[in-house]
């Protein structure tokens, strides 16, 4: 994943804060999902979703004065990190009319552009509606249905997990009065520095407004944690990517020591910003995923991901299956010379990095073992976004831009390099959307029929 948080273009006044406002009631849209014990034996869970606090209107605790407008902090309310956290509150959300988020039973639809808002990021809440639902992915299987038929080049309808705190960080950082109810506590392997509040304090100090996005900027601090990208996709390309970190929990970083695409040294932090990705097109299989292909993105599909452990209980393999039109379809096999298989293993990742000439940052952060410890408690995230850093070329086009398209690993999909420029995709495809539904979780082979 490339600079996920910075790349979101949010509502004009979107901001992360640590106080809870009272001007708009916060009501989480309901979303059901299923917990399974064996094939055909699943129990419905009554959950809900909450939008990330970076999208919310944030204002003075005393009135409706904005704490943050465009990509600039109010100098009076926010002269420094601690004062800003005390002075500012984030408020409730109107999910459909402001953010284009709707639910229906077990289905969640995210619309791309709604008024001045672009994209969204949401978390699954637990049945109490007080904290995030957490999942232990080890020796488990996660399955969902997805419709990407309305996601053109340059967009990313993502479903992934990170090692966020279940309460949004409220217990660790008492200054955070908003907590999970208001979508606080985000972290990922990019150690995002565009978050307006981290660990109960604002990110005002050192804040630099973005040069190409009127709504975002970068502060001195970032928020790091392991990340498991189960699904990053549009109708052209898809990628499955684990990202390890040196710590299994959320940590705050500072400046260029954060690494990732927010910093001068991409690989200077404690996490792997690139991960070990399995994109069928990048692995040399250009007939597997897309409109009219083996996995036909013109129709809804079921996506199955299995997390296999070794004898010691540590993650050793990530396997992928699809179910479409009643057929179970194994993941595409690699067609890259020197790289074999259709699942993510240590051997696959080592061979892939060598074949593509990539720095093996994955191994430097302990590879699959580096994410395994975090997988006992991860939070589910569902989002739709466009990319102000690399126009989503890393997912669906040729990347890096100056590389030769025929070199191994450069071609990620068939999209034109200009198709994902945010101004282009926002102007041409504002009504794009993604729908996630029928989420199931349980032991291996419990969430789908292998003989479908």
From Swiss-Prot:
Example of a GO MF term: cellulose 1,4-beta-cellobiosidase activity
Gene3D superfamilies according to UniProt: Glycoside hydrolase, family 7, domain (2.70.100.10)
InterPro entries in the record: ConA-like_dom_sf, Glyco_hydro_7, Glyco_hydro_7_sf
Pfam families in the record: Glyco_hydro_7 (PF00840)
Subcellular location: Secreted
Signal peptide segment: 1-17
Residues carrying sugar: 62, 285, 335, 402, 445
Reactions mediated catalytically: Hydrolysis of (1->4)-beta-D-glucosidic linkages in cellulose and cellotetraose, releasing cellobiose from the non-reducing ends of the chains
Keyword field contains Hydrolase: yes
Keywords: Carbohydrate metabolism, Cellulose degradation, Glycoprotein, Glycosidase, Hydrolase, Polysaccharide degradation, Secreted, Signal
Broad class of where this protein is predominantly found: secreted
Top EC group: hydrolase
Family: Belongs to the glycosyl hydrolase 7 (cellulase C) family.
Reported function: The biological conversion of cellulose to glucose generally requires three types of hydrolytic enzymes: (1) Endoglucanases which cut internal beta-1,4-glucosidic bonds; (2) Exocellobiohydrolases that cut the disaccharide cellobiose from the non-reducing end of the cellulose polymer chain; (3) Beta-1,4-glucosidases which hydrolyze the cellobiose and other short cello-oligosaccharides to glucose.
Protein name: Probable 1,4-beta-D-glucan cellobiohydrolase A
Source organism of the structure: Aspergillus niger (strain ATCC MYA-4892 / CBS 513.88 / FGSC A1513)
Gene name for this UniProt entry: cbhA
